[in-house]
Amino acid sequence: MASSMISSGTVATVSADRPAPAQARMVAPFTGLKSSSASPVTRKSNDITSIASNGGRVQCMQVWPPLGLKKFETLSYLPPLSTESLAKEVDYLLRKNWVPCLEFELEHGFVYRENHRSPGYYDGRYWTMWKLPMFGCTDSSQVLKELEEAKKAYPQSFIRIIGFDNVRQVQCISFIAYKPAGF
């Protein structure tokens, strides 16, 4: 108890005469992460206006309109991809050594829960596979050729391209490559 009452000047003179043990140096008690003996700190209010730190950019954010615009797969917020953009996406999945695969859906190409009701990534849709996965595919033009065949066979369907990792046995990428007219 007496050691906690020593002033810092007394400790300095004791230290000059002989080395002080580590326990002789007292530190002020801490409250949370800040010292209670530190200089006065200004406290910020935690109201809703102090949370956003991006200032004026908050006003330019937009909300996806839920009426009239369906949410599709990855990249669905972009305009329809051109043939060149699709080729670049397919080249990307080929560089990652993923197996390209095409799937199509005749009725619901958008997020729709039919067979599974819980929230999360899995939305209960089952798409039909177009032919077989393209094992050994090395060129995006092969995938785009199959995409054109699928469009001719099912012009009113949604068609997506999937990148499948056959080592980890997971689907790594999936995006809509074709939407029927009116979507």
From Swiss-Prot:
Major place of residence: plastid
FT transit peptide: 1-59
GO process terms (BP): photorespiration; reductive pentose-phosphate cycle
Keywords: Calvin cycle, Carbon dioxide fixation, Chloroplast, Photorespiration, Photosynthesis, Plastid, Transit peptide
Note: The basic functional RuBisCO is composed of a large chain homodimer in a 'head-to-tail' conformation. In form I RuBisCO this homodimer is arranged in a barrel-like tetramer with the small subunits forming a tetrameric 'cap' on each end of the 'barrel'.
Alphabetized HAMAP family for the sequence: RuBisCO_S_bact
Protein name in the entry: Ribulose bisphosphate carboxylase small subunit, chloroplastic
Gene source species: Malus sp. (Crab apple)
